[in-house]
């Protein structure tokens, strides 16, 4: 229930942010994943340039370390990940797990945005020390949905240490 509340709160935050970081995009209802790991602002099959918001709760394996990267891998035969400029990637940390981003970072904190046809990695220099329970939030603006509706497993990795699977629903 708590994860559903967090996902709903994030959807409201994203849709009302306007021009601020984590801005909304369109009228589509976000597609949530199990565990709230990945949300797509447009769940339609064949949608292009879809904003994907990744929310990953830090665990003990990364607690005490600086937030240095987040990677997301999609099924290579289904999704296409395009490149994104540093300034188009939104970054933040929800430090108290209330669904709202408390710490925000801009393109000056991004040391690299790398992608291939099915994944992306955002490399960071935030100076932010992760605590267990912190929820890192990254919005990546350039994912193309598959042509076939379905549930697709996505893997998100925080600091090359913590890996979590989620499901993106394409309608």
PLM feature spans:
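Low-complexity, intrinsically disordered segments enriched in Ser/Thr together with acidic residues
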Residues: 119-149
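Short, ordered beta-strand-loop transition motifs
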Residues: 44-49, 105-121
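Acidic, glycine-anchored loop motifs typical of Ca2+
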Residues: 91-103, 115
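Low-complexity, serine/threonine/proline/glycine-rich extracellular segments that form mucin-like
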Residues: 33-95
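Short, conserved beta-strand segments of beta-strand-rich sandwich/propeller modules, principally
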Residues: 11, 137, 151-153
């Amino acid at each position: 229930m708590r994860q559903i509340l967090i996902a709903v709160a994030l959807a409201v935050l994203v849709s009302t942010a306007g021009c601020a970081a984590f801005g909304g995009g369109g009228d589509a209802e976000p597609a949530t994943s199990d565990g709230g790991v990945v949300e797509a602002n447009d769940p339609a099959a064949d949608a292009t340039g879809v904003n994907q918001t990744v929310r990953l709760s830090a665990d003990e394996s990364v607690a005490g370390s600086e937030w240095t990267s987040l990677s997301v891998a999609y099924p290579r035969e289904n999704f296409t990940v395009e490149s994104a400029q540093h300034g188009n990637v939104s970054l933040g940390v929800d430090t108290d797990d209330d669904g709202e981003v408390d710490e925000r970072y801009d393109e000056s904190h991004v040391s690299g945005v790398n992608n291939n046809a099915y994944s992306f990695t955002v490399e960071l220099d935030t100076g932010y020390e992760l605590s267990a329970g912190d929820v890192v939030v990254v919005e990546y603006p350039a994912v193309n949905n598959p042509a076939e509706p379905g549930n697709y497993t996505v893997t998100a990795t925080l600091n090359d240490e913590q890996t979590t699977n989620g499901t993106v629903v394409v309608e």
